[in-house]
Structures are given as structure tokens and as C-alpha cells.
């Protein structure tokens, strides 16, 4: 099997190859929190996604960074991608996803998006309601199913 997933992390040059998706959702704010994005990349590789994955976090955890520069990178990546995939495994206090809430509301009617969250995620009722209201779809509750649908859409 040849893996054709190109990963571009925050602040890296955006050399997008093929179809692209942006992994939107909480990022670790503490080195003890585990990022869900590694699992997402593994799933995309398992299903042989051929394209670029834009990941709005550093390859290696950095406690302090230039937030506004990263936000600028995020906005460029969000506007450049073919699909925004929101996965909101919100868990207090380390995986809040507050910026993700704003991005979700901003892009829900502007770009192609998919949305999901685990059934035990904290405080996601409003996102669920808005997604159902604006798309007519039910949120995914399984990361693998969400990403398989992403691949299908981008083919």
C-alpha cells in the first residue's frame, strides 16, 4: 500500500497537493492532553486518503506560541481547503475547543463541512442543534465514520 497523505501542520508552508481537508477541533493546551489528530491521520492512511491534511497544531507540543500568527495560518488554511472536518472531543479542562466553536459557526454556511463528536463530549448540544438545523444531517459520533465520509466526499 502506498500512502498518499500529505500532512501540513500549523505555521508550515501550505503546499497543498490534491484534495485537502482541515482537521478542526480542540488542540491540546497542556502537554498531558493527547491530540486526537494523530488517530485521525492513522485512519486516513488506513483508508488510503490521497490528498493533503491541514492540521492546526504544531508537530511537537509548544506550551507558549505566537497565537495571532497561528490564527492567521488557520484562517488561510480554512479558506484554502476543500472540506473542513470538525471533530469536537471536548473535555474540560484541557480540550475545550473554544476557537473551534467560532470557526464552526463562521464556516457552517460558507464551506463544505462535516461535524462529529464522541457521545461523551462536554457541552456540544448547541453545535449538534446548529449542524442539524443548517445541514439536515445528524452529527457523527465516531471519528472513523466521520473520516470515511470525508474521503468519500473528496473523491
Q: Can you say where each PLM-predicted feature lies in the sequence?
A:
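Conserved catalytic or regulatory cores that recognize and/or transform ribose-phosphate-containing ligands
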Residues: 1-155
Amino acid at each position: 500500500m502506498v500512502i498518499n497523505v500529505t500532512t501540513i501542520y500549523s505555521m508550515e508552508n501550505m503546499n497543498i497537493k490534491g484534495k485537502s481537508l482541515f482537521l478542526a477541533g480542540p488542540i491540546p493546551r497542556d502537554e498531558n492532553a493527547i491530540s486526537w489528530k494523530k488517530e485521525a491521520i492513522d485512519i486516513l492512511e488506513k483508508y488510503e486518503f490521497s490528498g493533503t491534511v491541514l492540521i492546526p497544531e504544531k508537530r511537537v507540543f509548544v506550551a507558549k506560541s505566537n497565537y495571532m500568527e497561528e490564527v492567521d495560518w488557520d484562517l488561510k488554511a480554512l479558506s484554502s481547503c476543500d472540506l473542513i472536518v470538525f471533530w469536537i472531543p471536548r473535555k474540560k479542562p484541557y480540550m475545550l475547543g473554544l476557537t473551534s466553536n467560532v470557526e464552526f459557526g463562521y464556516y457552517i454556511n460558507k464551506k463544505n463541512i462535516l461535524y462529529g463528536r464522541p457521545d461523551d463530549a462536554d457541552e456540544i448540544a448547541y453545535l449538534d442543534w446548529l449542524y442539524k438545523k443548517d445541514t439536515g444531517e445528524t452529527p457523527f459520533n465516531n471519528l472513523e465514520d466521520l473520516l470515511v465520509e470525508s474521503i468519500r466526499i473528496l473523491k
